[in-house]
Amino acid sequence: MFPMVTEFMNYGQQTIRAARYIGQGFMITLSHANRLPVTIQYPYEKLITSERFRGRIHFEFDKCIACEVCVRVCPIDLPVVDWKLETDIRKKRLLNYSIDFGICIFCGNCVEYCPTNCLSMTEEYELSTYDRHELNYNQIALGRLPMSIIDDYTIRTILNLPEIKT
């Protein structure tokens, strides 16, 4: 055949192929139109975190036996445990316990391996401050229970996000 005719046929095939690709992309865009939005208006709406969410660590001073298992299993040796050996009863007495959340990677190893369950993960994730030294929590700050977002009337909580079907 003539070269001009074959070029015209190739041009027609390429045009049809391009139109098909544009149509496929448009169909994907239309399939997302009936889904609910994934984003939330953060300060005014908050998601209720799952049970397994790893937020700020809660510490119960009375349960701790100063065994330092949390320090040994921490990948960055983060918890600082100060204790004193009581010679009359031959047991350790905990003096101070602190965690710096500016360095913590929230892996949860300390909570998982604690033999007395004095450590637990809370759902509190708002730990931002203007000074990084304020993120060093001692046993008093670690012992405070987190404020539940369910009890705050100014915040609308979003319970269940629908599953995205693909």
Swiss-Prot record:
Catalytic function, reaction form: a plastoquinone + NADH + (n+1) H(+)(in) = a plastoquinol + NAD(+) + n H(+)(out); a plastoquinone + NADPH + (n+1) H(+)(in) = a plastoquinol + NADP(+) + n H(+)(out)
Protein origin, superkingdom: Eukaryota
Topological type in the membrane: Peripheral membrane protein
UniProt keyword annotation of Chloroplast present: yes
Cofactor: binding details: Binds 2 [4Fe-4S] clusters per subunit.
GO cellular component term, pick one: chloroplast thylakoid membrane
SUPFAM superfamilies: 4Fe-4S ferredoxins
UniProt record similarity statement: Belongs to the complex I 23 kDa subunit family.
Protein's UniProt name: NAD(P)H-quinone oxidoreductase subunit I, chloroplastic
Organism: Zexmenia serrata
Lineage, highest ranks first: Eukaryota, Viridiplantae, Streptophyta, Embryophyta, Tracheophyta
Recorded name of the encoding gene: ndhI
